[in-house]
């Protein structure tokens, strides 16, 4: 085990002791009430949540101005009204079912401590950079944001002031106090059957500014999570995080998983074909990654990582959420070039995983897909008409937030309108409890949306047909096939998929349902194909040149409104792969596309009377979407194929 991983496990005894001194529940009551919740026979509905939310405990969020903490975050997500940092009253139209507060493990609560410190104490530390940041944080919101931008760049470049890194024992004690109080609060707000509050943190690994961040999510309550401290990203590596998670599980009997995010800002490093330090990926490394990271965050405020037009030129809808974010890494200190894109985007990673599995016998990139917000306002909302911004500096009270530059570094290129109002995670579970939702993540029976709450279901098998819709097709899906996230063993005939999509009951109609297939061909080359398998008005929208025509557009740009006069409320099909080849390794996932609707930028333009630039106005209407987790088709062992 990495020494650092061991250190952060052993220090958890301090956390647990501090938390136990507070108002927390007894250790032996972890998960109280979960055993009394009546569970469905099969997962019967998607539970909606956000696994990536920051509060004033995050070093950047506080510096960017947020003054709401974990309690306000839990209140807001569970449907209560709160007052945003800028003074506006904020409430979700529909509460979430679960939440992971994922404050950065590095410097947990540090900017608040620096801000609250007496200036003479900072002067006494003898570091000019820290004193300058302190003064900037107190000068104005704009200067505070600039200070945090410098701090993040310094962390990425390994140039943080020594005063911030040379006293780990003091930092650990401060972290333990904050972490313990946070865990106690989560257990108080966790209401099995009504609202699930998960412990978690963000591991912020960022070599040279390239985003390799993960959210760590725990299945457990205070009695187990209180035995660890959040694992830091500074001066560590990804295998150290996995060792930390394994040590936690072995010592406590608990469970943890890691969720990579913003691969689009990794400059090709997130889904490499080599080890992080160079050389070919080993089977051991692939096994560790597959075990630790069953899902990936595909969409969020800082862009969408599903696909890129350069990698998928035949997919006319591959450019969603790409603008601005494809320019470079997170702080824009390094440009992104075309040769890096394959390591940035999830469709390509899924394809690479097939190739690696053929070589190694294990697939390190066999992950499900979720969305989340990465909001730094303590407000988990992925709704276009209720978008509270990435951070406090672009909450709705700032009328020009769509036009302002959003650059942590010095290069110009990203603007407020590049932010997406999304996304959410949907978990198919038998009930709203920590155990049920976490287990759905673990088995990859989850899907992502860019904000709307569409209901998407996917089953794969070998004997499904349209006739199954007339019976209990959900039972058929589970008993005769596998759900999204599952694996099928090749039987020598083409797989068939039961695909069902229902519109968000409070949202837009559906344009189409697509299947994305990736495979390794007989020459060992990676291939992909996109199939339109069901769409609205199929009798009127016949294919032209092999393509389904556009659904139309009802958005009124002058009022930021649309109508559901086009599209369909429900789309479903039993689809059989027409290009199946026996023994071919493949994956299939579903992409559900809505009709065009206004983005938050258009709502702002109408609300505040703003004239958007031409490029922003062209992007002010979008087709929101959902991405299912894949189903993998694996070659049967030779002995089985010979018997068939």
Question: What are these model-derived regions, one by one?
Answer:
Residues 217-219:
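Long, charge-dense tracts
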Residues 222, 232-236:
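Conserved, charged catalytic cores of large soluble enzymes
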Residues 123-165:
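Aromatic- and acidic-residue-enriched carbohydrate-binding clefts of CAZyme catalytic domains
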Residues 22-70, 74, 81-131, 168-171, ...:
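C-terminal functional module detector
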Residues 2-23:
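Gram-negative bacterial Sec-dependent N-terminal signal peptides
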Residues 240:
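Acidic, metal/ion-coordinating pockets
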């Amino acid at each position: 085990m990495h020494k650092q991983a061991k250190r952060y496990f052993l220090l958890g005894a301090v956390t647990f002791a501090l938390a136990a001194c507070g108002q927390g529940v007894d250790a032996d009551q972890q998960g109280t009430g979960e055993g009394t919740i009546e569970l469905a026979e099969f997962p019967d509905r998607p539970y909606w949540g956000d696994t990536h939310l920051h509060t004033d405990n995050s070093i950047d969020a506080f510096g960017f101005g947020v003054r709401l903490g974990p309690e306000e975050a839990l209140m807001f997500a569970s449907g209560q009204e709160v007052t945003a940092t800028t003074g506006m009253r904020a409430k979700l139209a529909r509460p979430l079912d679960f939440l992971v507060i994922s404050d950065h493990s590095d410097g947990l609560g540090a900017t608040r401590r620096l801000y609250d410190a007496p200036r003479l104490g900072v002067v006494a530390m003898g570091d000019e950079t820290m004193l300058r940041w302190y003064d900037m944080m107190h000068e104005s919101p704009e200067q505070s944001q600039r200070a945090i931008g410098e701090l993040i760049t310094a962390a990425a470049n390994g140039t943080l002031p020594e005063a911030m890194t040379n006293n780990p024992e003091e930092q650990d004690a401060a972290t333990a106090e904050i972490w313990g109080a946070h865990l106690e609060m989560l257990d108080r707000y966790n209401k099995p059957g009504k609202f699930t509050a998960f412990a978690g943190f963000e591991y912020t690994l960022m070599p040279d500014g390239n985003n390799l961040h993960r959210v760590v999510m725990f299945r457990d309550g205070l009695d187990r999570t209180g035995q660890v401290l959040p694992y830091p990203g500074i001066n560590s590596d990804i295998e150290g995080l996995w060792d930390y998670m394994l040590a936690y599980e072995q010592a406590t009997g608990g469970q943890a998983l890691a969720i990579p995010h913003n691969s689009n800002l990794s400059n090709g490093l997130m889904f490499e074909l080599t080890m992080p330090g160079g050389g070919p990926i080993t089977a051991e490394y692939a096994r560790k990654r597959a075990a630790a990271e069953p899902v990936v965050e595909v969409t969020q405020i800082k862009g969408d990582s599903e696909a890129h037009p350069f990698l998928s030129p035949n997919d006319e809808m591959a450019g969603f959420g790409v603008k601005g974010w494809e320019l470079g890494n997170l702080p824009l200190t390094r440009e992104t070039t075309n040769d890096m894109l394959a390591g940035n985007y999830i469709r390509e990673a899924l394809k690479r995983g097939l190739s690696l599995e053929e070589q190694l016998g294990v697939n390190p990139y066999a992950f499900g897909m979720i969305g989340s917000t990465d909001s730094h306002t303590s407000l988990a909302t992925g709704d276009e008409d209720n978008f509270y911004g990435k951070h406090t500096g672009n909450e709705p009270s700032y009328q020009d937030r769509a036009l302002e530059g959003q650059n942590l570094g010095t290069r110009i290129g990203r603007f407020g309108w590049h932010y997406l109002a999304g996304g959410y995670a949907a978990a198919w579970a038998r009930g709203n409890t920590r155990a049920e939702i976490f287990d759905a993540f673990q088995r990859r029976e989850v899907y992502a949306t860019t904000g709307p709450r569409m209901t998407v279901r996917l089953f794969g098998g070998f004997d499904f047909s349209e006739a199954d819709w007339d019976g209990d097709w959900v039972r058929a899906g589970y008993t005769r096939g596998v759900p999204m996230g599952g694996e099928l063993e090749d039987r020598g005939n083409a797989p068939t998929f039961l695909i069902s999509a229902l519109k968000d009951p409070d949202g837009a109609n559906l344009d189409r349902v697509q299947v994305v297939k990736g495979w390794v061909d007989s020459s060992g080359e990676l291939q992909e194909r996109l199939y339109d398998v069901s769409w609205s008005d199929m009798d009127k929208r016949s294919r032209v040149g092999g393509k389904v025509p556009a659904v139309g557009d009802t958005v009124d740009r002058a009022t930021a409104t649309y109508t559901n006069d086009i599209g369909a409320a429900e789309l479903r099909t039993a689809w059989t792969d027409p290009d199946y080849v026996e023994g071919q390794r493949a994956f299939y996932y579903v992409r559900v596309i809505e009709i065009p609707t206004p983005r938050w930028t258009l709502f702002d333009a109408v609300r505040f009377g703003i004239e958007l630039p031409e490029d922003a106005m062209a992007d002010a209407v979008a087709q929101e979407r959902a991405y299912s987790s894949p189903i993998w088709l694996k070659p049967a062992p030779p002995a089985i194929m010979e018997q068939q």
